[in-house]
């Protein structure tokens, strides 16, 4: 759907004449000039102007002008509510339908409340549907209001602009947030009140206050009041204020029905005798406010003046919603006092008037006391009163601002529209006496004296007691400014440049058509110049731009129509902006040859700027050459070289003057031949008088050679031409025009011979119209005379803008333009090609040929095309026989459309503009969150999901003993809270089926259960449970299975009815059972085991707190619902699910997926199930896998008995991972592959501190003689980054004894160096290296940092090179080893890292540590001990025999004396975990010590002494924090904060427990594998972890058994536990997976038992697809690869792709990238803008990972994690992938 915001936005003043239609002329004006001055002299310091407004309300009213027409017609927009809005509530509960049938479903509704133009604001569809429609409407209406105010939103970016929005409805929030399974990440801000103003502030980049106001129905007028106050206080410069309301749910309507506030027919009848309540309405209104004096200075329209406002409260009344007349009276008086006006001066009141029987009389009587009879006004001068509510409804939070907008319109038009729905005046109001009058018909307000402009009051009240009031005044001073808006007769109008733009290319058709339609409707009432200034200065300029040059409205309409139909037009330009235009425009002044007879005549008469240039040059030309330039312009330029030179120079400066007046100055200038004179003037190198002397006196000298020379353009390169004319005296190359053409100059004979020869050879030759052999040695005889002619005449200056030369070999030379320069300019060849190439190298992409006709534009295009593939423009200014001014404006339009800043877009307050010019046309799409649910009929017959059974509607079958339960099962009403998939299908857990039987047969038992066919949840199916006195059966059928009524039913489960409900035992001795079970399992054992055999999720949220076992028995202490999740009315089903799950693990030694298939007997005792139970499982004496289970309370009372539960294996993939195969790895260092061609470095810059300069000297001597220069620098900022073509920066870290300081300093230095290089424009030619030695522990942190640098910025990162001999400079490794993050020199050979499986210890090895064991007589210490990892490690240690554990953490726990009280969830979890460990016999000591603090060593030693514990036998350093920052964003403080717990903490432990500690069995450092794989953003974390690895190696060398464990993510815990899927996606992208805690501990044990292992890398490499690229080189030896399936087509596609190149490859990649973007963002491919940054299109971090994987699998190339950051648009990505695929 496409809607226009203001296509007919014309506010015609009541006293305005027809010729002012469409302008900003106000309603009140004065013809007295003295009155104007008086108005300006008035003190307006406290006055606030309303300079713009917009609205969207029922009745298809989308603008203030449409609203005014609707009011005049007494429009009534009331009607029926769209029924779909309440459907989710009808579906939510069977009783709702009856209630909703009695709820008022009438009112005032928007037809398109679900519609939004998300693409316009670069909001993804996913986020858009999670945004409250109020946010969407407010955003669009705020944009419309700014356009109405003539403010381009882009001008407000970063400004002190505030947003105050009234809001009171949270219907959408209730609707979507109560649908818990589908709650989305964007719904927080997306549905919050604060999100309404904040969304506007965010998207427009506004820096002022942004506040949501909730004062019920007074909200929006309260918002306006606070906005006014903020402006007056100087708190904000501009305010966007308003309110919005949306009626999306029935809740509040139901409340108001109960309160009797709503009329039965949903209509408002303000002031009518039949008024019995109001009709609720929805919509939005926004006004733009600015201080009045500032508005006048800025040339803004002033719609009205906000003179005063006030807000108060009712205080205590008969009820909180009862009105208080006294409060309403007082707030009105307060507003009048603020406005400094008397109450009898008010002409109109916009009343609140909600149409309630109590409210209307109360309010009217109060207003009469102020404005009516109580004001003392004369009966002949009543005050008119009205209310907008009968027209558009009561907009509640938006009501006040809509009343304000109506009041502004009343003052603008000087009329009061008739009151809608007013039949009989309210008899409870004394209308005759109170001097207030509702308008029954259109009323024209009396003007009164000029000293008293029209005024209006606006009242708005909230049902919570807030009362608000505002006073506005018509602005009588606008006529002063209207004088400068005088209309320009269209017939005499100069050409105008109309600038249109859209954010996406497909919008221009509707935009152009809308403007064309509006111009037709205006019928000449607005000038083309006014339209042009409005579009250029008062509208946003988007990415896709269009410019139209027109000299009449009719011409503009025709061109717009062509643009709308995509028909090319001579005077229409279209382009899109990009980064290429950033440097600005280059003006190129061409030389001899552009002349034509009438070339300056039009401009001389039409352009004052051109005329001034001609008149300035006229006397000089007359004096120097003896002819009149003015006469020549009229008579036509003669064909004489000397005169052509002067007139060409005149045209250059004249066109430049016009161009600067229309476009603004250039960034750089260059001249071609004669054109260098004008370039010198425009750049400031010469004055125009000096340059004119150069041209005229040289032209006079040329007379000697006139008729003696010739020139020709030849289609040969300059080098080819020189070779061919080497044997032809009298000719030479005069101009190097382009790579394929040049101009040859010489004698007439020589040129004649050459031309004939080349034509015979098929070379294109074209004569140049000249008879002088310019730019040849033939002119050397003129050198002396020219020097003499210019002697003492020139005083050249340094140019004030970039000036390039085509006469010098160095086009950037700053050589002064003295006489010698002009001699050289006359004789030397013109080096146009190399000069344009230099400009391109310097970043210029926009070129304008300043000449009367283009003669070198084509050459410029050829040169740029040869030089770069970037977009560029080269445009002429004039074209022979084309209208001159239109042509120049077209050039300005091309610059603007390309993205260059041009003068027409600069805001000029003196230029006329019109708010009636159409604004943005919205391209709406529907975005409305689909809320899950079923129909009311379905709900009425369904089971209750929270009961965790399938018992639906119960029916006793007549004449039988049978009972039938019927229900409907689907995803939304599954009877279990979690997930329970089997082979990809969600099935109902066996526990639910057993619970269904038990509840149906209660209090009897269930026997001989046969679980035959799983009950699948989706697609939807009918369920029947049928039972009699003997049997019970569950059957099901798909809803669509109706072809055979009987055969479509499937028997799922059967059972027989038991005789009694008594278990075989009534009590279990828990302690005795636990005593005989020696094996302690981890609490997560069952979940981990089931995950390993293919159970990816659990149906219920039970959790094991203690688990012991033997070969045949298990005992588990189980929390049935530990997190108190909803969806479980009782806990028995969750406990039964735990029982079936745990029992299936009895056979864990033979891992496979087992499911219950039969149960001999199930009996429940019928008591409430407690939160915590014990489950005792025993293998039965049977030939099959069968178990007996008893569920008891903590005291041992039996709650349920399950006898003979048989399990059968389920066919499918078994993922058992009890072995460490593929799990544990170590880093190996094989020799690196060497490149065939070395990198060449012209210079090596050493970045180092003083202490290492001696080492640098050694390195410099080794480099000598290799043609490589060197330099030494202490600061990265001093590096010579722009002076060498190729350069290596080598960072040498400083050596100190303070390890932590060394680590932090060296990391900071290297990051700073990288940041400096990245900020350099020449970074592709620079490589950054770091050189370290493992002997210095403090440098080891750089290893991790280097790996992240390699990931984030491979374009600058050389590598980190670790030396075995620090005296040998690694030049060979730097030059021959490519794409390596870290290089290790060992045995003189450069090596790179690879992961290889860790070799297990030999069976009888005595070296190295023994298998990890724990002693109850020792103490074990864990840092980070209160984190999830630390707690998990402690739990595992206890299961392995540890009994004394210190948990070190920065945080402290509450005193143990209050542990039994309630605490925050995180603290409660820690306390519960510790207590559960202590119940197992362990002693846990939580100790609050910050291990990274300098006092940590002292504090730790003191704590150990105080606690008097046995010696510490094991240390685990698991402390750490993660703060992701990309390299460019890193700050030293943030980096050190991450390093401290890792490095300082490890050093503290190293000090307290040195390698010589006799009691220490293990010293384990928790590191991360993320550093090896280069996780982006983790530079600080990787640096800290690489230090831990080095510390373990260092301790090993001292005889210790330290180990660093480089973990992948632990599933469900640690720093990735709350990553919302981002971490899992990143792991997948990097080629690995996470591990379960059980796998982690198994790996730990395995590594500890491996001889000599100082580290272990714990991860699983995922299987790669057959054609998928290796995600990281370090995985090369361990990553398995899937076999290519038979018939798999990817290989064929890849082969076809490999055959593509050039344009075909680019087209292929473009299709792929756009498809991947489309899929990721859920938008159509044709809406993917190639030039918009993907984050601006709504792509967040999680989407980015999916996008990368999609690209990687489609293009079969490695896609790095920072790719989208470096190449943010589709265009950039296509360029990058084309380069990669070509290689």
UniProtKB/Swiss-Prot annotation:
InterPro entries per the UniProt record, alphabetical: Ac_transferase_dom_sf, ACP-like_sf, Acyl_transferase_dom, Acyl_Trfase/lysoPLipase, Ketoacyl_synth_AS, Ketoacyl_synth_C, Ketoacyl_synth_N, Malonyl_transacylase_ACP-bd
Region (Disordered): 1-40
Region (N-terminal hotdog fold): 948-1064
Pfam families xref list: Acyl_transf_1, ketoacyl-synt, Ketoacyl-synt_C, KR, PKS_DH_N, PP-binding
Location of the Ketosynthase family 3 (KS3) domain: 45-474
Keywords noted in UniProt: Methyltransferase, Multifunctional enzyme, Phosphopantetheine, Phosphoprotein, Transferase
Ranges for region Product template (PT) domain: 942-1215
Consequence of gene loss (knockout): Abolishes completely the production of macrophorin A, 4'-oxomacrophorin A, 4'-oxomacrophorin D and 4'-oxomacrophorin E.
Protein origin, superkingdom: Eukaryota
Annotated PROSITE patterns: CARRIER (PS50075), KS3_1 (PS00606), KS3_2 (PS52004), PKS_MFAS_DH (PS52019)
Biological process annotations from GO: fatty acid biosynthetic process; lactone biosynthetic process; methylation; polyketide biosynthetic process; terpenoid biosynthetic process
MF terms (GO), sorted A to Z: 3-oxoacyl-[acyl-carrier-protein] synthase activity; fatty acid synthase activity; methyltransferase activity; phosphopantetheine binding
Start and end residues of each stretch annotated as C-terminal hotdog fold: 1078-1216
Region feature Malonyl-CoA:ACP transacylase (MAT) domain, mapped onto this chain: 587-884
Known catalytic reactions: 3 malonyl-CoA + acetyl-CoA + NADPH + 3 H(+) = 6-methylsalicylate + 3 CO2 + NADP(+) + 4 CoA + H2O
Domain PKS/mFAS DH, first and last residues per copy: 948-1216
Residue ranges with Polar residues bias: 1-31
Carrier domain location: 1707-1781
Active site as annotated: 217 (for beta-ketoacyl synthase activity), 352 (for beta-ketoacyl synthase activity), 394 (for beta-ketoacyl synthase activity), 673 (for acyl/malonyl transferase activity), 980 (proton acceptor), 1130 (proton donor)
More about this protein: The macrophorins cluster contains a single gene insertion (encoding for the terpene cyclase macJ) compared with the yanuthone cluster that produces the linear compound yanuthone.
Role: Non-reducing polyketide synthase; part of the gene cluster that mediates the biosynthesis of macrophorins, isoprenoid epoxycyclohexenones containing cyclized drimane moieties. The first step of the pathway is the synthesis of 6-methylsalicylic acid (6-MSA) by the polyketide synthase macA. 6-MSA is then converted to m-cresol by the decarboxylase macB. The cytochrome P450 monooxygenase macC then catalyzes the oxidation of m-cresol to toluquinol.
PANTHER family listed in its UniProt record: FATTY ACID SYNTHASE, SYNTHASE, PUTATIVE (JCVI)-RELATED
Protein name, entry field: 6-methylsalicylic acid synthase
Organism field: Penicillium terrestre
